[in-house]
Amino acid sequence: MGAVIALVIGTVPAASAEEKVLNVYNWNDYIGPGVIANFTKETGIKVNYDLYDANETVEAKLAAGHSGYDIVVPTFVPFVARGIEAGLYAKIDPSKLKGWSNLDTGILAAMAKNDAGNQHAVPWIVATVGLGINVKKVQALLPNAPLDSLDILLKPENAEKLKACGITMLDSPSDVIPVVLHYLGRDPNSEKPDDLQAATDVLLRIRPYIRKFDSSGYINDLANGDACLSLGYSTDIVIAGVRAKDAKSGVEVSYRIPKEGTLQYIDAMAIPADAPHPDLALAWIEYNLRPQVMAETANAVNGRSGNKAAQAMVRPDLTANPQIYPTPEVEKTLFTGPVASRGYDRLRSRAWTRIKSGT
C-alpha cells in the first residue's frame, strides 16, 4: 500500500510534540502504492494509515467521538450525508484548495444535493455494486447463466446450482437492500416495511446457497478461484481480476453491471469535526487533488476518479471499459443510495441479521 501502514488496533498512535502526524482511515486496497510515501517525502508529515471494510465501522467511531482520525473516506450517500446532518464532519472551504477546479463538476453537483456548496466532502472514487463472475466455473454449472443479470444470483434455481463453486455477498445492508429493491421494480430509497420485507424474502430464499457475507476477503476468494460469483464493489472485483491474471493461475474474473441497473456510489474524503490535525488533513486533500496523484490511485484501485483532470492520466483500458466508466445508456439505469432515517436503519439492520442467520 504505502510507506507507513498501521493496522487497525482500536486506537490511533500518539505523536511527539515535534513531529507532524496525520491519521488517515480508509478502505483496504484503496490508494495508489506511492501516494503515502511521496506525500511524506514532500511535506514531512508522517501518515498513520488504518484500514476498515465497512462504512458502519467508521460511522460508529465518529459518532462515539474522539476517534483520533484526521481523514476518513466513507461512502458519501448515506454515510457522509447523514454525518453532516449529525455534525460529525468539519467544513472544508473549496476556495482555499488550489486543486478544487480539477474535480468533476457533475459529481460535485450530485454531492451538493446532500452537501450544499460542497462544504464537507471531496470525491475520491466513483464505483458501482455489481457482479463478480468466474465465467468458466459459472458456465460449467449453469451453461445458460444470465451473466449480465441479477437473476444469476437472486433466482434460487440459479443460486442453488452455483452454490458448489462459491457465492459471496457484501456484508452491507445499505448496499445490498437497495439493489434488491431496484431489481424488484421498487423504489430503492423506500422505507416502507412491505418493501423491506419483499427484499428480505428474496434474500432469504437464496440464503442457503451463499457461502459467506464479506466486504473485503472476497477479493482473494475470487482471485484464487474459491468463489465463482460475488455481489461486490466494482473496484474490488476488478482488483480480483488483476490479481488472478498476475498469478497466472488460469482464473478469470469478470465484472458486470447488472442490466436491471444498480447502485452507484461516491466515496469521499472528509475531515471529522474533532480531528486533531485539521490543517494537516487539508494538506492531504490538497495533495490528492493533483491529477497525477489521483490518477495513480485510480489506476491502482481500477476505479473511476472523481478528479476530471486526472482522467487523461488514467489507464486507457480503464477509461474505455464501460463497466468502470459507464456509457450514458447504462448511467440511466444507475441510482444513488438513500439517506436512511435512523428508525429505518435499525429495521434494516434487524432484517439483515435475519438474512445472515437464515431465519
Which residue stretches match the model-derived regions?
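Early extracytoplasmic/lumenal segment of secretory-pathway proteins
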Residues: 18-83
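Ligand-binding pocket segment of bilobal, Venus flytrap-like solute-binding proteins
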Residues: 165-180, 184-254
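Conserved C-terminal helix/tail region of periplasmic/extracytoplasmic solute-binding proteins
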Residues: 220, 328-359
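Ligand-binding "clamshell"
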Residues: 83-91, 109-110, 115-118, 209, ...
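A structural signal for short loop-to-beta-strand junctions that line the ligand-binding cleft
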Residues: 68-72, 90-135
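Short beta-strand->loop
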Residues: 90-101, 151, 247-263, 272-275
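Bacterial N-terminal signal peptides
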Residues: 1-11
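Mature extracytoplasmic/periplasmic domains
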Residues: 267, 272-333
